Amino acid sequence: MARQPLPVIVSLGGINGAGRASGHHALARMGYDALDQGQKQRTLQSLASMMGLPSASDQEQYILDHTLIRRVEDNHFDVDAVLWNQRFPTESNGHPVNFDIERKHLPDDIPPSWKVTSTSVTHVNVNIQGHQEFLLPTNRQFEVKAAGQLPTGYEPGSLYPSRSHPRGLEMTVCAASDALGNLGLDWDMIQRRVPADKVSVYAGSAMGQLDSAGAGGMLKARYNGKRVTSKYCPLSLAEMPSDFINAYVLGAMGSTGATLGACASFLYNLKNGIADIRSGRARVAFIGAAEAPINAEVMEGYAAMGALATEKELRQLDGLDDNEAVDQRRACRPFAENCGFTIAESAQMVVLFDDALAMELGATIYGAATDVFVNADGYKKSISGPGVGNYITMAKSVASVRAILGEDAMRRGGLVQAHGTGTPQNRVTESEILSRTAEAFGIEGWPVAALKSYLGHSLGAASGDQVTATLGMWHHGLIPGINTINALADDVRTDHLAFSAEHRRFDPKDAQYAVINSKGFGGNNATATMLS
């Protein structure tokens, strides 16, 4: 059998609640308490630069408080006064409703119960008999008040001529630029060495662009008395992140697109890139995902499913009364007593070369992405229910490690990046899957990381958060603890696993592999194998 090229990771980039992925800054923010003073200062300086602060020297607490999961900030929306239109029915009851209005604001189709009388060239009087319904703009308290947000003050659209791009696409441009800058090689030189059709780009968004500059604006414009612009529809497409990378960052002309698999979408795209490198269809592959779901409409959809941790439920978990403040930093509690996940925004990117190109150009090799396994759940009673697919992907991933590294390295040199959303169902099903997989392969004390406790759940980009953070763990020799929890829930299976609320140090030389697990809604299970 002919030798296949090995897909190696030569760069990473991205932005999420912990800061920049490049330079492993984001991982350092998550493990901040375990850093030495020099590392802490470097982390603070990186974040201060993003946040537009002149100096980090006297801003430590401000920087820490305005990163990771926290109360939703007003640049997204006001959680204490969410705008909505309340139905406002009226009855004249013998006393007609009467008001003056500018002629230009009259509806095109005058209701039959309206009597309209001209009062001037520009104004009319409206007299309404009987029943009439209005929509009254008002506001209300939002049930969910926490999200994983980009560092306060960091506005990706201000860093390039964004021209009213949706936030997810602005984040995409910044993430791709971050990865390109972190590559350490001149992109023009790479383009001269690699044929144009040998550069693949796979990046997307699980939900598309749903903020007011994308599909969100398109769907609600007329309802709110505004017009639909020509940008709303095309910029909302789910594969648009790859299009933006090709057009605005790389000028790439190779294979492109996005494969969507709910929360596993980043890994689906990584699978595409690995396949292209292995087959020789590409020598370079940019892999990414971007999600910007922190708006009231999207969050209300997840809240209606019972998926998000609400302030009321967090109060009940912590035994707080209505006058006591909820710690929004602890909203996401994987594998503990919990009540839902915490939504987040993120854009993550990795760059793959084939191993020969990496050696030829002298690229830094951060690790190898050897496999991504995808399996559906099969028949099940509910589309949201768990199934057998993730058992299969986990088993295949660990078997792949054993085939490449051998039995001893598989048992002693790895870690698992859990999906770890913070929902009651996930803590039971995923801990069962991880435990049974470890048991089947003879692994004891398998370290489990659950980074959504810091970052929140960025949907299609979530497994990208896991991948880039894993590279940071190998660099720093640090697994951030699940520090939002007091104890594991009683229904969490712990056999053969090592959960920890505390940060754990290890010698980076001992790192052999990581298994990245993702359980996408609907049965989109994906597990990736990464080698150090």
What are these regions (language model features)?
Residues 176, 201, 266, 273, ...:
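Conserved small-residue
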Residues 281-339, 372-386, 420-427, 444-497:
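Acyl-CoA/ACP chain-elongation machinery
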Residues 171-185, 238, 242, 249, ...:
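Active-site-proximal alpha-helical scaffold in enzymes
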Residues 48, 123-170, 208-272, 305, ...:
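Conserved catalytic cysteine-centered active-site region
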Residues 190-201, 256-260, 282-290, 364-373, ...:
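Beta-strand segments within the central parallel beta-sheet cores of soluble alpha/beta enzyme folds
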Residues 6-19, 31-189, 206-218, 237-255:
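A glycine- and small-residue-enriched flexible loop/hinge segment at structural boundaries
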Residues 3-17, 313-407, 414-415:
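Condensing-enzyme catalytic core mediating Claisen C-C bond formation in acyl metabolism
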Residues 1-9, 190-196, 408-410, 441, ...:
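Flexible, low-complexity linker/loop segments at domain and module junctions
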